[in-house]
Amino acid sequence: MNKLTFHNNKAMQDRRRVCIFLPNDKSVSIIINVKILCHQLLVQVCDLLRLKDSHLFGLSVIQNNEHVYMELSQKLYKYCPKEWKKEASKVRQYEVTWGIDQFGPPMIIHFRVQYYVENGKLISDRIARYYYYWHLRKQVLHSQCVLREEAYFLLAAFALQADLGNFKRKLHHGDYFEPEAYFPAWVVSKRGKDYILKHIPNMHKDQFALTASEAYLKYIKEAVRLDDVAIHYYRLYKDKREAEGSLTLGLTMRGIQIFQNLEEEKQLLYDFPWTNVGKLVFVGKKFEILPDGLPSARKLVYYTGCPTRSRHLLQLLSNSHRLYMNLQPVLRHLRKQEENEEKKQYRESYISDNLDLDMDPLEKRSRASGSSAGSVKHKRLSRHSTASHSSSHTSGIEADTKPRDPGPEDSCSGSAMHRKLKTCSSMTSHGSSHTSGVESGGKDRLEEDSQDEEIEMLVDDPRDLEPMPEESLEVSPEMCIYITEDMLLSRKLNGHSGLIVKEIGSSTSSSSETVVRLRGQSTDSLPQTICRKPKTSTDRHSLSLDDIRLYQKDFLRIAGLCQDTAQSYTFGCGHELDESGLYCNSCLAQQCVNIQDAFPVKRASKYFSLDLTHDEVPEFVV
């Protein structure tokens, strides 16, 4: 295409070049129309990357050393520099060696994580999990958790296993990796390269047989535990006259943090989990935080410096809060599955080791007495439950002294000498004083065992009894939760809390207020409800998020009373709950109501308010 054809073609003059920087230090260039929507650009980027699940990612531009995420409903030119919107004929011609031709200089856009999750199994797409892992890799390089130095060595071992595979002595020796690519600069400066290259290979060797997918999951789980990795930073001002922001707002997965900017570090001043934030108000440049349950005089007032930044922060905070609330039942379910898997692994190794120790002397004794090996094979091993209600037996692993033929009632017997034991007991005890074990018994013991198992089925999740396939080393798609756009833009998702946006006209001012109510207890009704106490516990306000899940049934009962009101929210779907108390997974993508524009474009003089309180649901509800 010659210059004459290009300058005479109006359609080509409206095209520009954008350069998309990816989390893995690579980039892609795209020629697009200058009036394209941000959503259309994101779709093109995902198509190039073959990424199917992009709901945790976003497009951002750097403004004043901050990542400003684009609203997907806006046009791209609202975020681009003024020079980028000029006609191509007026743009200075750059050298072709830089990849810039008659389309003008490229606009720099970053494809990065916008919403953090604490468990990699929530990311269903394999490629999305890969870029999420690389984003955390870059965040770890800037981490400053001095008291968690050992975590960086463990993360480096997971990353080496994911990048290089199993440790091989012939290949992985000497400087087979760059410490600067896996450790923060202060760790390399403190320990030195020689120290890292000496000790990391042993930690890399310990991750043998760990697949890349499993290494990604372990890296994600460990990296988000660092305080300054899964976080977004935004500058704040104490008053309007400040030239440089002396405060920093940190948006984490679980809430909001306020830091004091010192010379080379940030000092934490306030840490507000989402359960302790009552209301967020943006009035022009003013940013107000009202802690839940405190009078209005205790509110924190800061300034953003620009009304546009106020609106951007409001949307980012509200979407992060909504996603956090919607994912809590799913995370509780994943935690329970992981805990059950850990218990099964521990229980199986415990039984297997003791069986090997106890069967050897029995076998020697049988050989010494001249008994046949077949009689040993048919010895019954009965496993006693750890959740017996009245027994006081001690722990131990014993075999029956009398040989007996296998029958249909012998669920734990087999033809092999080392029989597989069915792990189907609960770890919770209802009055028993004994520990787990394997002991001898006859027909009466069989009846007691079956009775114990029936009682345990009322406590345990039946899905925990199903054996996991040993041959699958990759992460199963059933273990992943599909995060959809409805989790970010929905009124109700499986009954979980969503945003309700209202326009309230003010009689004393020409401005209007956008109120977003979610959950909790309104500070306006605090005097009337200050004496309201939960019936089951008197100290639930001090419980953590992990402890609150113990009261899930009470919450389902309370939240069900106000399900039909416009400002009430419940956890779980309308289908019948199984014995685990969770909702059906099919409702994650089906039972939701979309909001076309959760935060419509408004003038800078608008009064924005994000209210996280509620009048009918108690404060302890998560």
Curated annotation (Swiss-Prot):
GO terms for biological process: apical constriction; protein localization; regulation of actin filament-based process. Coiled coil: none annotated. Its main location: cytoplasm. The modification Phosphothreonine is found at T523. This is FERM domain-containing protein 6. Transmembrane segments: none annotated. InterPro entries: Band_41_domain (IPR019749), FERM/acyl-CoA-bd_prot_sf (IPR014352), FERM_2 (IPR035963), FERM_central (IPR019748), FERM_domain (IPR000299), FERM_N (IPR018979), FERM_PH-like_C (IPR018980), FRMD6-FERM_C (IPR041781). Residues 384-395, 425-438 have a biased composition (Low complexity). Residues 357-452 are annotated as: Disordered.
